[in-house]
Swiss-Prot record:
Pfam families linked to this entry: Bmp
GO cellular component, one term: plasma membrane
Lipid-acceptor residues (S-diacylglycerol cysteine): 22
CDD domains: PBP1_PrnA-like
InterPro entries: BMP_lipoprotein, Peripla_BP_I, PnrA-like
Disruption phenotype: Mutant is unable to grow on inosine as a sole purine source.
Name assigned to this protein: ABC transporter nucleoside-binding protein BmpA
Phylogenetic placement of the source organism: Bacteria, Bacillati, Bacillota, Bacilli, Lactobacillales
């Protein structure tokens, strides 16, 4: 079966602004008449719904959808927490047994488990987020042009660095994280061709201690902007940046670039010279929550896009850059690069 690719409209992503302000972790639905009998759930990867990143965004999107349809958490919508890869199949089985018929696998590591669950449950609909499953009519593949938002982050990093050295910390090597890496490097070098980019992988998406160690080495070697694309590993990067910046005057701060959602709220600290400050330069935003809500709405209306790849990019608002603490110079450079990417003047590498 030939795979169809869908370009998502900006209208379909109009709920981005609403979701951006959503940070509730205890939504249980609202009063009123239930608007659908569709039961939807997400199966997380090992980082869980409080990862301040990818899974959290997905859960926020499902909560928003559930509340809009007057569903109750635990009966109309829910999440199944995976503590390791061995939980994926068990969680899919549990979701099926509890009557959930729209199931989202959050992250490329769930690809095999999602494919198998879809084959075993042909009357249910599945969505693999951040990966591609081919030739299964009851599976939608939701992918992101992460390289585009990462390119903008690279532009920002190159404009912000004082040392001409910046860093990139990936979780585990994969096609998805490679997109971030390649876009970031290309964006930085479009501003400064001689900039040095230190690239390291943690070999994990959950080892915060490893993230802290890598970040300490990067900052110690002169990297003054570090982009972390590593799930829970990023927690350690933020921890190291906060500790280091708290011992410095504000003018000497080092930066972190956030990922998947606007992570500016993680960058608050007090500098050595007593100033309340923030070390998150910008954040690459992946509207995972909007994807969940968008596809759930389509499914509710009988229009589940099964057997397709749904692509979210800069043009349709599926990815973007939160400008957080960017200067006006950085904002202008990012705006130009964004326009050029959307207009096709810049082709961002992904491999």
């Amino acid at each position: 079966m030939k795979k169809r690719v869908i370009a998502v409209s900006a209208i379909a992503l109009a709920s981005v602004a609403v979701l951006a302000g959503c940070r509730s972790h205890d939504a249980s639905g609202t009063s009123g008449k239930v608007k659908t009998d569709l039961k939807a759930a997400i199966v997380t990867d090992a980082n869980g719904v409080n990862d301040r990143s990818f899974n959290q965004s997905a859960w926020e999107g499902l909560q928003s959808w559930g509340k809009e349809n007057n569903l109750k958490k635990g009966t109309g919508y829910t999440y199944f927490q995976s503590n390791s890869a061995s939980d994926y199949t068990t969680n899919y089985n549990s979701a099926e047994q509890q009557g959930y018929k729209l199931l989202f696998g959050i992250g490329f590591s769930l690809q095999d488990a999602t494919s198998a669950a879809a084959k075993n449950n042909p009357k249910s609909n599945f969505v693999i987020v951040d990966s591609v499953i081919k030739d299964q009519k009851n599976v939608t593949s939701a992918t992101f042009a992460d390289n585009e938002s990462a390119y903008l982050a690279g532009v920002a990093a190159a404009k912000a660095t004082k040392t001409n050295k910046i860093g990139f910390i990936g979780g585990m090597q994969s096609d998805v994280i490679t997109r971030f890496e390649k876009g970031y490097v290309a964006g930085a070098k479009s501003v400064k061709s001689d900039i040095k980019v230190d690239i390291q992988y943690a070999g994990s998406f959950s080892d915060a201690a490893k993230g802290k160690t890598i970040a300490a080495a990067m900052y110690g070697s002169g990297d003054d902007v570090v982009y972390q694309c590593a799930g829970g590993v990023g927690t350690g990067v933020f921890s190291e940046a906060k500790a280091l910046n708290s011992s410095k005057n504000e003018a000497d701060k080092v930066w972190v670039i956030g990922v998947d959602q606007d992570q500016e709220y993680l960058g608050k600290y007090k500098s050595k010279d007593g100033k309340d400050s923030n070390f998150v330069l910008v954040s690459t935003i992946k509207e995972v929550g909007t994807v969940v809500k968008d596809i759930a709405d389509k499914t509710k209306d009988g229009k589940f896009p099964g057997g397709t790849i749904v692509t979210y990019n800069l043009k349709n608002g599926g990815v973007d850059l939160g400008l957080d603490n960017a200067t006006s110079e950085i904002k202008d450079a990012v705006a130009k690069a964004k326009t050029d990417i959307i207009d096709g003047k810049i082709t961002v590498p992904s491999k």
